[in-house]
């Protein structure tokens, strides 16, 4: 089971990783606008979620942690990529409502709700972006949960699915292939 403390620590760790790799992600940013700010925007967005995590006790439920992260990210969202990231977390949070701890099936289902929320919010969803990476990750997580409900097993499948999907983004978006890069937002979610 994933505890609230583990989820809280994962949000903080993810924020630290994105911040550390911000420049690398900024340099990948060519779609939809080559303005080189995806890493910055996403680090600010998840950074807001990380800041909210600092106030939470070790014994908080996964529901409360997910809701606090999602609310803070929505308020702190910057740019298109940050808004999409916050929507993924908002849906993820809805998927974990009323959970004290989360098993693998709940984790995968929550991610799928997050993906659905993000796709619905984007006027013209484009494949080869963070949306694709998150969708494939959620699909891999759901398939893994059918085999083994262990959240670590499911999380590993989610991460592998995200990495696999990220590698395909240049095949789905010719502008990425031409530049020889993967999708910047997808890089963060992988």
Enumerate the predicted regions with their spans.
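N-terminal loops that bind phosphate or other acidic moieties
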Residues: 1-190
